[in-house]
């Protein structure tokens, strides 16, 4: 998800999306450990999306 798309969401929606991505990251890491993960790049994408969301929430707190 792009940063501009995230900025269009409300803070609670961002936090809900972040929670869902954290669950997905957990599942991806579990799949990686068991050797079932095919697309290892997805872990990086999810981590970066979580970071973008946290950054935007923090920007709103400071504004």
Curated annotation (Swiss-Prot):
Top-level lineage group: Bacteria
GO cellular component: cytosolic large ribosomal subunit
Molecular function (Gene Ontology), one example: structural constituent of ribosome
UniProt cross-references to InterPro entries, sorted A to Z: Ribosomal_protein_uL29, Ribosomal_uL29, Ribosomal_uL29_CS, Ribosomal_uL29_sf
Alphabetized UniProt keyword annotations: Ribonucleoprotein, Ribosomal protein
Family: Belongs to the universal ribosomal protein uL29 family.
HAMAP family listed in its UniProt record: Ribosomal_uL29 (MF_00374)
Protein's name in the database: Large ribosomal subunit protein uL29
Originating organism: Listeria monocytogenes serovar 1/2a (strain ATCC BAA-679 / EGD-e)
Gene: rpmC
